[in-house]
Curated annotation (Swiss-Prot):
Localization annotation: Nucleus, Nucleolus; Nucleus, Nucleoplasm
Cellular component GO terms held in the UniProt record: nucleoplasm; PeBoW complex; preribosome, large subunit precursor
Keyword Repeat: yes
InterPro entries the record matches: G-protein_beta_WD-40_rep (IPR020472), NLE (IPR012972), WD40/YVTN_repeat-like_dom_sf (IPR015943), WD40_repeat_CS (IPR019775), WD40_repeat_dom_sf (IPR036322), WD40_rpt (IPR001680), WDR12/Ytm1 (IPR028599)
CDD domains assigned: WD40 (cd00200)
One example of a Gene Ontology biological process annotation: maturation of LSU-rRNA from tricistronic rRNA transcript (SSU-rRNA, 5.8S rRNA, LSU-rRNA)
GO molecular function, one term: ribonucleoprotein complex binding
Keywords carried by this UniProt record: Nucleus, Repeat, Ribosome biogenesis, rRNA processing, WD repeat
Lineage: Eukaryota, Metazoa, Ecdysozoa, Arthropoda, Hexapoda
Listed name of the protein: Ribosome biogenesis protein WDR12 homolog
Ranges for region Ubiquitin-like (UBL) domain: 10-91
Pfam families listed in its UniProt record: NLE, WD40
Recorded family membership: Belongs to the WD repeat WDR12/YTM1 family.
General function of this protein: Required for maturation of ribosomal RNAs and formation of the large ribosomal subunit.
């Protein structure tokens, strides 16, 4: 078999974890030059004999999506052609559909969705609350400089609580009366000496963490009443809140912060490092060195992997569990400018989204490093933040003064079920 020239046949086994799409587990002889299109035709022909309708599939060969000819994929992986090759096929994830464009008065630098609400933060110093159907509910003044990050603390039918951080060197705790549609600033959190670029609420909603241009990581109480011993009566009465913990270790701005669990924090920084912090010990548990400034980072509780967004147009994947944390597991190519923001899906183990200064959002599968699954178009200028906290909606904000809302598979399936 002249495999180097892409000729001849390859013995393959076709496998799927979706049992209703399973085909007979026997060796199939296929041409080495086949692509995803031909494999789709082949598998669908086998399924058609069972009475199934046509389905679009993607194909995984040695844990990576097939994006060209099978022979080229195997040659790149240095895989022998002598033995039967296992090919896994999965139903193709549907393309997210544009749903809404939410117009703001200035750059939208922070977005976070929860339930039927979307919280946004802008460069005009205001917060905004919207429904995920595109209705504007409230504009909230309070900060004195552009807002850089937001996160929900808790949300039910009657009350919403959230936190915002800003270039004005503060974070603010807010309480929203949903029925009356009124918002109160519960506390102004002071302690940083420069702008606060990142904020994240703990899984139990009792604390939140902030990362700043002053290189400090700070942890604060998210409770309505801060009963800490270090809080003076004067500060309580003025609504000022001070940090419970201050952690030093980064050399430049902390651009990303996320809770990995109840006592562990992940931070990413312009100093080219990721750090994992143990709050029970109040110190660094692990460090991952990279070769680029990190603009954003995202940790997945489903697969324990970390993604980073950087200035060199690429996204990178690291394993939080390995002792060789500086080794890049994968690099994802597709953006044409700085990648500003990245986030794992909270429900789909392999999927994540990114936003870039090339004006594009992209939906990825971490097993497809050479190309995204889909480009999510709509922004006319730089994408500044992206969020997939609500599994139904991918939400992004940009310097075109808009928030773009895309319906993901969960919302699309629900829409089909109600028709």
């Amino acid at each position: 078999m002249d495999v180097d020239n892409g000729e001849g046949q390859v013995q393959v086994h076709l496998k799927t974890k979706q049992e209703h799409y399973a085909v007979p587990d026997v060796p199939y002889a296929i041409d080495g030059t086949v692509t995803t299109a031909e494999l789709n035709t082949f598998v669908n022909a086998l399924l058609l004999s069972k009475g199934s309708s046509a389905v679009d599939f993607d194909f995984l060969v040695f844990d990576e999506y097939l994006r060209g000819r099978l022979c080229d994929h195997l040659r790149e992986k240095a895989i022998s052609f002598e033995d039967a090759i296992e090919i896994e096929y999965v139903e193709r994830f549907p393309a997210p559909e544009p749903q809404d464009c939410l117009l703001h008065d200035d750059w939208v630098s922070a977005v976070k969705a929860s339930g039927k609400w979307i919280l946004t933060g802008c460069y005009d110093n205001t917060l905004n609350i919207w429904t995920n159907k595109g209705k504007h509910i409230l504009t909230i003044p309070g900060h004195t400089a552009p807002i850089k990050a937001v996160d929900w603390i808790s949300l039910d039918d009657d009350t919403g609580r959230f936190v915002s951080s800003s270039q004005d060197q503060t974070a603010m705790l807010w309480q929203w009366n949903v029925g009356a549609n009124t918002v109160e600033c519960v506390s102004v959190c002071k302690g940083h000496e420069r702008g606060v670029d990142s904020v994240s609420v703990s899984p139990d909603g009792q604390r939140f963490a902030t990362g700043s241009w002053d290189t400090m990581l700070k942890v604060w109480s998210a409770e309505l009443e801060d009963a800490g011993e270090g809080t003076s009566k004067r500060m309580k009465e003025s609504g000022v809140r001070t940090p419970k913990i201050t952690l030093q270790g980064h050399r430049e701005s902390i651009s990303a912060v996320q809770w990995m669990d109840a006592s562990t924090l992940l931070t990413g920084s312009w100093d080219h490092t990721l750090k994992v912090w143990d709050l029970s010990l109040e110190g660094i548990k692990a460090e991952i060195s990279t070769n680029k400034s990190i603009f954003d980072a995202s940790y997945s509780k489903l697969n324990h992997l970390i993604l980073t967004a950087s200035a060199d147009k690429n996204l990178r994947l690291y394993d939080s569990r390995t002792n060789q944390g500086s080794v890049v597991r994968n690099t994802y190519l597709g953006h044409n400018a700085w990648v500003q923001t990245v986030m794992w899906s909270t429900t789909e183990e392999f999927l994540f989204v990114s936003g870039s200064y090339d004006n594009q959002n992209k939906l990825w599968d971490c097993r497809s490093p050479k190309a995204p699954l889909y480009d999510l178009l709509g922004h006319g200028e730089k994408v500044l933040d992206i969020d997939w906290s609500n599994p139904k909606y991918i939400v992004s904000g940009g310097s075109d003064n808009t928030v773009r809302v895309f319906k993901s598979r969960k919302a699309l399936v629900e829409n089909m079920d109600t028709k």
